[in-house]
UniProtKB/Swiss-Prot annotation:
Gene3D superfamilies: 3.30.60.30, EF-hand (1.10.238.10), Thyroglobulin type-1 (4.10.800.10). InterPro entries: EF-hand-dom_pair (IPR011992), Kazal_dom (IPR002350), Kazal_dom_sf (IPR036058), SPARC/Testican_Ca-bd-dom (IPR019577), Thyroglobulin_1 (IPR000716), Thyroglobulin_1_sf (IPR036857). It comes from Homo sapiens. It comes from the Eukaryota. Residues 1-21 form the signal peptide. This is Testican-3. Residues 393-436 are annotated as: Disordered. It is found in: Secreted, Extracellular space, Extracellular matrix.
């Protein structure tokens, strides 16, 4: 009996000590009991409220990841809502109805409470109203379907159209489908749905390619003329050249042909043409040059090159005549050279300038035949389109810079002596310059 009483006394003493400790804790807390609820523990609240102004304020929407996000977020760091939509991690995360998903990067997303977000944005001096639309909106989540990529007007590729619409809803922006498939969109949309079937390019597309290349060649030509560079003049064997097949076009087209012809064989092979295939999305560039190869030998001669570009433009004589008429207006200017055109809009073989009393021979594109200019009527019965023996004439647009680079066949002595070449090139006394 005495042993039982002793045990009861020990238990009572232990219970009394626990009660006294609890009473002391209540007194330290201002006389208010927490009833055993850890949410009212000020020490715990202080730990989780380290980003709040007042100690002990509990945020029922608090999230550890969310607090870590705000710890590193600064007013100068925007909320990354403009990540690549196809890799948006928020598309795979579902937040509670009181929170919104914010993407930190392409792999990390956090759920942030509306209350915490508004509070932090106020502290940062950001007007939360500008975020209320895209952040607080209820955007429809996309189902899991087989990918059917589309390119949006914002330049991003979306796995399917629903994700494009979802991203537009989240950002509060207007995003439309620019084209089907991955970005960037091709300049010309294929008419065939099969990727294995090559689309044939139309004549209009060939003309557009020719015009773009011609403008590009002209810009390069003018830039090269303005910025003359010192270079080493290469002198290949004279026997390698056939002067009867020189380029018939003496403008930027002929200039570009000579720049591409790196082995000086007066032919362009695929390796020399490859530098022009710059835009992989331009499907008709390679097809255009394939159409230039009339002999189907995988080589483009200088005549094929010139004719290929010239046939893709409006009739040259009619174009020049129209331009002259536009400049003159109603009154005809005295002394103005007026080209003679055939019924198809190309140049007649014989051209004359009445004011100076001279006539000369040209091909159908207006390229003057070397040595054909005389006082009086010229005899132009030769088929000059295939003779290749053309001079510059009134249509010569090459500069002295090209003379220094390309005049390599004037005299055999020039080939043997490079130093003598430089002096001869600067001497304008040679009336028989031939351009390569």
């Amino acid at each position: 009996m005495l042993k039982v009483s002793a045990v009861l006394c020990v238990c009572a003493a232990a219970w009394c000590s626990q009660s006294l400790a609890a009473a002391a804790a209540v007194a330290a807390a201002g006389g208010r009991s927490d009833g055993g609820n850890f949410l009212d523990d000020k020490q715990w609240l202080t730990t989780i409220s380290q980003y709040d102004k007042e100690v002990g304020q509990w945020n029922k929407f608090r999230d550890e990841v969310e607090d870590d996000y705000f710890r590193t977020w600064s007013p100068g760091k925007p909320f990354d809502q403009a990540l690549d939509p196809a890799k948006d991690p928020c598309l795979k995360m579902k937040c509670s109805r009181h929170k919104v998903c914010i993407a930190q990067d392409s792999q990390t997303a956090v759920c942030i409470s509306h209350r915490r977000l508004t509070h932090r944005m106020k502290e940062a001096g950001v007007d939360h109203r500008q975020w209320r639309g895209p952040i607080l909106s209820t955007c429809k989540q996309c189902p899991v379907v087989y990918p059917s990529p589309v390119c949006g007007s914002d330049g991003h590729t979306y796995s399917f159209q629903c994700k494009l619409e979802y991203q537009a809803c989240v950002l509060g922006k207007q995003i439309s489908v620019k084209c089907e498939g991955h970005c960037p969109c091709p300049s010309d949309k294929p008419t065939s749905t099969s990727r294995n079937v090559k689309r044939a390019c139309s004549d209009l597309e060939f003309r557009e390619v020719a015009n773009r290349l011609r403008d590009w060649f002209k810009a390069l030509h003018e830039s090269g003329s303005q910025n003359k560079k010192t270079k080493t003049l290469l002198r290949p064997e004279r026997s390698r050249f056939d002067t009867s097949i020189l380029p018939i076009c003496k403008d930027s087209l002929g200039w570009m042909f000579n720049r591409l012809d790196t082995n000086y064989d007066l032919l362009l092979d695929q390796s020399e043409l490859r530098s022009i295939y710059l835009d992989k999305n331009e499907q008709c560039t390679k097809a255009f040059f394939n159409s230039c190869d009339t002999y189907k030998d995988s080589l483009i001669s200088n005549n094929e090159w010139c004719y290929c570009f010239q046939r893709q433009q409006d009739p040259p004589c009619q174009t020049e005549l129209s331009n002259i008429q536009k400049r003159q207006g109603v009154k005809k200017l005295l002394g103005q050279y007026i080209p003679l055109c055939d019924e198809d809009g190309y140049y007649k073989p014989t051209q004359c300038h009445g004011s100076v009393g001279q006539c000369w021979c040209v091909d159908r594109y207006g390229n003057e035949v070397m040595g054909s200019r005389i006082n009086g009527v010229a005899d132009c019965a030769i088929d000059f389109e295939i003779s290749g023996d053309f001079a510059s004439g009134d249509f010569h647009e090459w500069t002295d810079d090209e003379d220094d680079e390309d005049d390599i066949m004037n005299d055999e002595d020039e080939i043997e002596d490079d130093d003598e070449d430089e002096g001869d090139d600067d001497d304008g006394g040679d009336d028989h310059d031939v351009y390569i």
